[in-house]
A protein has these predicted regions:
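C-terminal hydrophobic helical "lid"/dimerization subdomain
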Residues: 2-8, 40, 316-368
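Hydrophobic membrane-insertion alpha-helices, especially the h-region
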Residues: 9-21
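Glycine-rich beta-strand-centered segment in the early N-terminal region that forms part
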Residues: 66-82, 96-142
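NAD(P)H dinucleotide-binding glycine-rich loop of Rossmann-like/cofactor-binding domains
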Residues: 102-115, 122, 135-198
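Mid-domain Rossmann-like dinucleotide-binding core that forms the NAD(H)/NADP(H) cofactor-binding site
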Residues: 169-240
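A short acidic, Gly/Pro-enriched loop at the edge of an enzyme's catalytic core
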Residues: 247-255
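Glycine-rich phosphate-binding loop and adjacent beta-alpha segment
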Residues: 263-334, 367-368
Length: 368
């Protein structure tokens, strides 16, 4: 018996030592590399790049190679982009799970940003859906640049005619996330009671409006300074979280969309109806290892044992849903909320502001 405990103790010590070593390795960021020289005949563009993980100061405005034309792709001149929590997770390389895809000591890809809106400059010979001069919006890694190249069938669609480029750039990731959380995961329908926790943020402001467009009765949770904003975009009830804990109230909801992760799933169970659904969106767990994956695991473990549903998901940015959102916006049912606008050279400041976690709606970067 003593031998068994001794072996177990040695194993535990080794596991702790291995974890500490791995943590040390992952927390070590490689030095920022310098920009390579471009051949003299290279077509160039300005773009935000990052060559190492860290704070917003690692983001640099550089000249890099302009995307080359391709038969099945659309070359877009970017007029505006927007920043998302996804961007600063990649910028910092946290949670460490991100580095499994982005690179361990340093990023594999130097490009930054996803959301964009702009004008089609040229199309490949096989492209039939778009033509030069079309105003479009969508998502493509490397959107914080003067140009992006997108597959014809990729995440790009005609821009809503009633939106500016800045407004359209605010849409893709946040609005598609809100749409899919409500429609696909939450199965929202007319007459339901829906609560949006984090109603004044990027995803939240879209979720309030989309839920209302589906006929739901929407309650928004936000801070004191954002009460009027959330009410103005369609919430029939607004709760100030600095004065009231909605999980201690008597109201029960058919669907809760949680964009901020301020309560446990046990808290949410109290205010969900017996057959209600909680949809958790984004980086709810700030842990440096697994981040949102832990929220997904908890939801998966709990759901089989209760009548309520607990879902964690990440959105799939696709062309069809960009079209759905375009229709909602052209019908006047959804309008992007923009907090601040920065120039491309000010992207580090834009990312720093977003990272504080108090943006009202979206943070936009103008490119051209």
């Amino acid at each position: 018996m003593k031998r068994r405990y001794k072996v177990l103790g040695i194993v535990l010590v080794l596991l702790v030592a291995m974890s500490a070593t791995l943590a040390s390795a992952l927390s070590h960021n490689s030095p920022c590399g310098s920009a390579p020289a471009l051949p003299g005949d290279t077509e160039r563009m300005k773009a935000i790049v990052y060559r190492c993980y860290g704070s917003p100061e690692v983001l640099k405005l550089e000249e890099i190679a302009k995307p080359a034309p391709a038969d099945d792709r659309v070359l877009i001149k970017v007029h505006a982009a927007s920043v998302n929590p996804l961007d600063w997770h990649y910028m910092r390389g946290e949670p460490y799970l991100v580095r499994a895809m982005a690179g361990m000591g340093a990023p594999k890809s130097i490009h930054m940003g996803v959301d964009f809106a702009g004008t089609v400059e040229s199309v490949g010979k096989n492209v039939t859906r778009f033509k030069p001069g079309d105003e479009v919006f969508g998502g493509k890694h490397g959107a914080l640049a003067e140009y992006v190249s997108v597959p014809e069938n990729g995440s790009v669609a005609m821009k809503p005619a009633n939106l500016t480029f800045a407004q359209a750039a605010a849409v893709p990731i946040a609005a598609v996330t809100a749409l899919q959380a409500l429609r696909d995961q939450g199965k929202v329908h007319s007459g339901q009671t829906v609560l949006i926790n984090g109603a004044s943020g990027g995803v939240g402001t879209f979720a309030v409006q989309i839920a209302k467009a589906f006929g739901a009765n929407v309650t928004g949770v936000c801070s004191t300074r954002n009460l009027a904003l959330v009410r103005s975009i369609g919430a029939v009830q607004v709760i100030d979280y600095t004065k009231e804990d909605f999980t201690e109230g008597s109201q029960r909801y058919d669907l809760i969309i949680d964009t901020v992760g301020t309560h446990s799933m046990w808290d949410y169970r109290r205010v969900l109806k017996p057959d209600g659904t909680l949809v958790m969106v984004g980086a709810l767990d700030k842990g440096r290892w697994l981040g949102p994956l832990w929220g997904s695991a908890k939801a998966w473990l709990m759901s089989p044992f209760v009548s309520q549903k607990f879902i964690f998901f990440l959105a799939d940015l696709d062309q069809a849903d960009l079209g759905v959102l375009r229709d909602l916006m052209e019908a006047g049912k959804v309008t992007p909320v923009i907090d601040r606008t920065y120039a491309l050279s000010e992207t580090p400041a834009a990312m720093g502001y977003l990272e504080q976690g108090h943006a009202r709606g979206k943070v936009v970067v103008t490119v051209n």
